[in-house]
Amino acid sequence: MQKRESKYVIVARIAYRLCQRVVAPYSHLKSPHRFTQPQLLACVLLMFYVRKSYRDMEEWLLASDAVIKELELKEIPDHSTLNRTFKRFRIKLLEKLQRTLLDELQPNELGIVFDTTGFSPTQASVHYLARCGRKYDHFYKGGYAVGIESQLILASMSGQGPGADTGFLEPLRRKARRYGLRGKWMVLADSGFDAITIRLGDLIPPIRRGGVMKLPERIERMELVSAAKLDGYFGQRWKVETVNSVIKRKFGDEIRSRNLFRRYREPIVKGLIYNIHV
């Protein structure tokens, strides 16, 4: 009887091989050579996948022989080592890891759906916050571009809310366009993305400011969206809502880091490990 392989082992293997392709083994010639950079990066990605703290991840690795074998670790990295590794994570590195993975999978999409979702700035429960009377007037946002066919995250970025999603439109478009059908792909999004940078063919419902629509191009776009709704194509937007739900259920709906710069990295990390997961 064939033994079933753990999902954790599969994720560790994909993350480790991905990091090996992108990152050099050591940061400098006189590195201690106890761990390679790909090993440590893969451990941090796996830490977010299993939703463990730095200290708990150290203990989890001690009990996970199959994962240790997959990562080729000769010893277990200390929790402080994992912390320093995530500190070295830069958004450019995360985006390079994402591009490398997607270039291997080669998605080619006709429709790409944009959406944002909010992440709590604290790990405290809603009950605790209600009892102590503490309120937060902001949250962190992850903006994701999801392919309709592949349901992969083709582009991701982070920001802070509350606020309009219009600022996410063009950055997501620039990052995702390499995975769209040349000259044919289109953007699907809700009216929160209704910005002046909208292009011809974008399926984004215009906002009725004052209840009346006067500009011909906005009326034309409203008719285009209405036709797409009748055809059922605009209904494919639900796929990005599913992706948002998976990210929050599997990897948490909160931001764990206390450092401001690392807080903005976490929504992008969650997008990367989602692609590794699926």
Enumerate the language-model features and the residues they cover.
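Catalytic-loop motifs flanking and including active-site residues across diverse enzymes
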Residues: 36-42, 168, 239, 243, ...
